[in-house]
Amino acid sequence: MTRVKRGNVARKRRKQVLNLASGFRGSSSRLFRTAQQQTMKALSYSYRDRQQKKREFCGLWVTRLNAAARLYGLNYTNFRHNLKKAGIQLNRKVLSQVALRDKQAFEQLILLVKD
């Protein structure tokens, strides 16, 4: 059986893992085995939190819309239902930005919806 020399491949792999772990604290950024474990954990956390971020922002938009609609005597569910009946197709993100940044435009939306 022939001898397999993998020094370059192994070094490249270890260097790649240690580069990914460069911002970690303590031995997690210096020792290969702990760095490998921590990078796997960090990558799984980052994947999970990218999904969670979407849910949290959606909840934030709903909360903002509910607060803004209550100033005009509506709640979020009635506001959304009346928007749908009026044929206004704006998503939660855009509606919350309008409510936050442009009070007059949001008030016009409320007047359209209330009638």
From Swiss-Prot:
Its main location: plastid. One of its GO terms (molecular function) is structural constituent of ribosome. InterPro entries: Ribosomal_bL20, RIBOSOMAL_L20_CS, Ribosomal_protein_bL20_C. PROSITE patterns: RIBOSOMAL_L20. Keywords: Chloroplast, Plastid, Ribonucleoprotein, Ribosomal protein, RNA-binding, rRNA-binding. Pfam families: Ribosomal_L20. The keyword Nuclease does not apply. It is found in: Plastid, Chloroplast. GO terms for cellular component: chloroplast; ribonucleoprotein complex; ribosome. GO terms for biological process: ribosomal large subunit assembly; translation. Belongs to the bacterial ribosomal protein bL20 family. PANTHER family: 39S RIBOSOMAL PROTEIN L20. HAMAP family: Ribosomal_bL20. Binds directly to 23S ribosomal RNA and is necessary for the in vitro assembly process of the 50S ribosomal subunit. It is not involved in the protein synthesizing functions of that subunit. This is Large ribosomal subunit protein bL20c. It comes from Chlorella vulgaris (Green alga). The gene is rpl20.
